[in-house]
Amino acid sequence: MTELNKLTLADSIKGLKNKDFTSTELVNAHIQQIEKHKNLNAYVTKTFDLALKGAQIADQNYAQNKARTLEGIPFAAKDLFCTKGIRTTACSNILKNFIPNYESSVTQNIFNNGGVMLGKTNMDEFAMGAANITSCFGNVINPWKANNDNSDLVPGGSSGGSAASVSGFMASAALGSDTGGSVRQPASFTGLVGFKPTYGRCSRYGMVSFASSLDQAGIFTRSVLDSAIMLEAMMGFDEKDSTSLKAEVPQLQSAIGSSVKNMKIGVPLSLGEGSIIEPDVMKMWQDTIELLKNAGTEIVDITLPYAKYGVAVYYVIAPAEASSNLSRYDGVRYGLRVERENMTLDEMYEMTRSAGFGEEVKRRIMIGTYVLSSSCMDAYYLKAQKVRSLVANDFNNAFTKVDTILLPAAPSEAFKIGEKQNDPTIMYLNDLFTIPASLAGLPCVSVPAGLSARGLPLGMQIIGKQLDEYNVLKVASTIESGVKHIKFEPKGF
């Protein structure tokens, strides 16, 4: 029999319903795996007692035929989802001992559906990073290793802990957040399905903010069906979030295995020309195009003329919003406070923020404050907002001709820890292919579609029209079926 922690979420639900095993056994299998692989540093807070209590309730519900959708399924949550009575830090020293007195809407939705939480996962500080190396708890190690090379690799960021937990069989699914690619890029680096829904599909209430017009909850799973199951539980209107969409949650599971015949898939190959895209990634892109052609889709060459400015636009808008959002961390009401005798209020603010924020967060606050200053507002911030509209228009125009768009999730395979650490610009380019869809608020997924020459996973990104998660999952499911001969599983796990 397959080890319980290696079952997909859908197979775990099936096994629990058939009483092949109990939720307590399933949770214990995951706890053992977490303890076995502590060195990956995927979890920053473990809630095993809570998970085992939840598993006992789940077992009772199964015995009484009262099981909910996710009854007894062990999941992990990125440490920026506020969890009532459980430490929530955003992996920053400024919030290192913060315990919220309320629950985020997304975690509450999962609890309401019967999910049990194993713990909170490591992440880049305040979700600012692409390699999970800016956390105050230290970096996360990718469970994957390249062929004939034992070097530690990054899991991607900012949701690196969530990605490592699912890839390393330490959770059935894990919540992440995606602002500019923080679910899709780590999913590509760790061989997972990483889904970011339409902006506003999942409530942002109770999520520690980075850039409010871009932040969206997402999910990591080991199959496309698992993503559909989790999304149905996570999504829905929430009056506590002013950007939440009043849209009915579709029956996403029926998309799995549905025919894509006669669907039109847009391919902006020109976006890959002259970029930092690696040959292995380009080959995967071409192979996926052939796979979809063979499945009966029509491949349409499209252009997204303004998408190439996405990274520049993002690194004006996101830091601007971050500088505003992070101004609340001042040591007055909660979080870290640095004090000494005869200190003025201004000195307390200054010393608290200097001690509490890491280098990357400080860099982005400074950039954001600069672009919002009266002398730079027109030249940078307002111009970036105009180009953001042009990027969104590019997608609107493309979607008059096609149903979905196909792009790599990342320009490279996972790289070594420390490799790009000293050059922020090179690090920012990791999000080259994910940022455009974020700027337009579109639903998108990274699905494992191939291995590099060094045996590392590569993810293909499918982007859909607003609120069209269904077709995104349909195409992702077709790609998943087409590469089922490849084992997307790290060695030694």
UniProtKB/Swiss-Prot annotation:
Enzyme Commission no: 6.3.5.7
Subunit info? Heterotrimer of A, B and C subunits.
Q: Which gene encodes it?
A: gatA
* Name of the protein described by the UniProt record: Glutamyl-tRNA(Gln) amidotransferase subunit A
What does the entry list under GO cellular component? glutamyl-tRNA(Gln) amidotransferase complex
InterPro entries xrefs: Amidase, Amidase_CS, Amidase_dom, AS_sf, GatA
The answer on whether this UniProt entry bears the keyword ATP-binding reads yes
Which SUPFAM superfamilies did the record assign?
Answer: Amidase signature (AS) enzymes (SSF75304)
Function per UniProt: Allows the formation of correctly charged Gln-tRNA(Gln) through the transamidation of misacylated Glu-tRNA(Gln) in organisms which lack glutaminyl-tRNA synthetase. The reaction takes place in the presence of glutamine and ATP through an activated gamma-phospho-Glu-tRNA(Gln).
Q: Which family does it belong to?
A: Belongs to the amidase family. GatA subfamily.
The species is: Rickettsia canadensis (strain McKiel)
